């Protein structure tokens, strides 16, 4: 076990998000709009994706310098063939205490049991509306909520810890905030509202479309009073609340209205092996090239540590500054949310 590595602001490296694929079976307007990610879009070919051996090797190195939690993302990670085999390998690594997955839930019904048996502990399911007419417009594939809701139930039944994520955008699905809160309060499933963010350069973001945490709290609190809950750990992303008189949680991810850059402990690896230190990054460090040129573990580790030590990212603090406004940022579907 090497010494924990900290960045230039003293933030430790604790969480690793690994994108296993850049493809998705949805075309959500805020992430992979169909007019950009159309039939001719050049997704990564299989030979450019990190192999399971390469992912395991990197995860082991990250675990050795303080990473405890791994989250698998995409694209849609359940499109990656044999994903439970990767999870089993990651779950066996010394130092890794938590493995999660973010998914649109379409394939959860079929895969939940195998994922759980492989060592997956928790799953976050993206669902941006409870009413089909709204959800179908958002996902761009005319898919109803039914398979997603079935996937959520399947995940719970096999013993996975389940949370639901909802990106809220004014004029798109803000009408769904209360129906979603009602649905998942009744089911006892934590729901996390995510402020619409300017990730990437293709989702047409502007601040006027953001529904802030304070607005969401007022919308929900008028019907279901809520109170703040204590954070579980340093670097926790969601601001957690509980419905009064209940232990059911609701959370808010406030990248726009209340930056959490000062406590960000997350690194990201894209499906083709680039190492990013911020969700809003403009460039990454190519670890795949090192993996495929007989680079030693010590050499790889030195690169990883150096990148993190020199990390100065605080985009959400700088969002309104002129220098941040025209940055060409990496797309969320490529880097993982």
Curated annotation (Swiss-Prot):
PROSITE patterns (alphabetical): MOAA_NIFB_PQQE, RADICAL_SAM
Residue ranges of every copy of the Radical SAM core domain listed in the record: 8-227
InterPro entries: Aldolase_TIM, Elp3/MiaA/NifB-like_rSAM, MoaA, MoaA_NifB_PqqE_Fe-S-bd_CS, MoaA_twitch, MoCo_biosynth_MoaA/MoaC, rSAM
Sequence positions that bind S-adenosyl-L-methionine: 30, 75, 126, 197
GO biological process: Mo-molybdopterin cofactor biosynthetic process
Xref: SMART domains: Elp3 (SM00729)
Keyword GTP-binding annotated: yes
Binding residue positions for [4Fe-4S] cluster 2: 261, 264, 278
Record's keyword annotation contains Iron-sulfur: yes
Cofactor: [4Fe-4S] cluster
Binding site for GTP: 17, 71, 102, 163, 266-268
Catalyzed reactions per annotation: GTP + AH2 + S-adenosyl-L-methionine = (8S)-3',8-cyclo-7,8-dihydroguanosine 5'-triphosphate + 5'-deoxyadenosine + L-methionine + A + H(+)
EC category: lyase
GO terms, molecular function: 4 iron, 4 sulfur cluster binding; cyclic pyranopterin monophosphate synthase activity; GTP 3',8'-cyclase activity; GTP binding; metal ion binding; S-adenosyl-L-methionine binding
Keywords: 4Fe-4S, GTP-binding, Iron, Iron-sulfur, Lyase, Metal-binding, Molybdenum cofactor biosynthesis, Nucleotide-binding, S-adenosyl-L-methionine
Record pathway: Cofactor biosynthesis; molybdopterin biosynthesis
Annotated EC: 4.1.99.22
Source species, domain of life: Bacteria
Gene3D superfamilies to which the protein is assigned, alphabetical: Aldolase class I
Cofactor binding, per record: Binds 2 [4Fe-4S] clusters. Binds 1 [4Fe-4S] cluster coordinated with 3 cysteines and an exchangeable S-adenosyl-L-methionine and 1 [4Fe-4S] cluster coordinated with 3 cysteines and the GTP-derived substrate.
Family according to the record: Belongs to the radical SAM superfamily. MoaA family.
Function of the protein: Catalyzes the cyclization of GTP to (8S)-3',8-cyclo-7,8-dihydroguanosine 5'-triphosphate.
Subunit organization: Monomer and homodimer.
Protein name according to UniProt: GTP 3',8-cyclase
Lineage: Bacteria, Bacillati, Bacillota, Bacilli, Bacillales
């Amino acid at each position: 076990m090497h010494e924990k590595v900290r960045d230039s602001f003293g933030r430790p490296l604790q969480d690793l998000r690994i994108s296993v694929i850049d493809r998705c079976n949805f075309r959500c307007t805020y992430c992979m709009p169909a007019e950009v990610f159309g039939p001719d879009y050049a997704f990564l070919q299989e030979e450019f994706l990190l192999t399971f051996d390469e992912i395991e090797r990197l995860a082991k190195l990250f675990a050795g310098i303080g990473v405890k939690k791994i989250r698998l993302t995409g694209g849609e990670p359940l499109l990656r063939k044999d994903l439970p085999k990767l999870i089993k390998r990651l779950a066996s690594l010394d130092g890794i205490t938590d493995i999660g997955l973010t998914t649109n839930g379409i394939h959860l019904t079929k895969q939940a049991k195998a994922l759980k048996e492989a060592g997956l502990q928790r799953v976050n399911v993206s669902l941006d509306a409870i009413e089909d007419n709204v959800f179908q417009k958002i996902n761009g594939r005319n898919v109803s909520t039914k398979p997603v809701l079935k996937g959520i139930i399947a995940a719970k039944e096999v013993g996975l810890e389940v949370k639901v994520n909802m990106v809220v955008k004014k004029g798109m699905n803000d009408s769904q905030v209360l129906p979603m809160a009602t649905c998942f309060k009744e089911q006892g499933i934590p729901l996390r509202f995510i402020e619409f963010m300017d990730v990437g350069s293709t989702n047409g973001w502007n601040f006027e479309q953001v529904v802030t945490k304070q607005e969401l709290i007022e919308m929900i609190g008028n019907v279901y009073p809520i109170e703040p809950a204590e954070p579980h750990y340093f670097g926790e992303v969601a601001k957690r609340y509980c419905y009064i008189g209940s232990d059911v949680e609701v959370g808010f991810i406030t990248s726009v209205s209340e930056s959490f850059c000062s406590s960000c402990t997350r690194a990201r690896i894209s499906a083709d092996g680039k190492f990013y230190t911020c969700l809003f990054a403009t460039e990454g460090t190519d670890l795949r090239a090192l993996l495929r040129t007989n680079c030693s573990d010590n050499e790889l580790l030195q690169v990883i540590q150096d990148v993190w030590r020199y990390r100065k990212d605080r985009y959400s603090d700088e969002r309104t500054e002129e220098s941040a406004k025209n940055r060409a940022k990496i797309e969320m579907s490529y880097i993982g949310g």
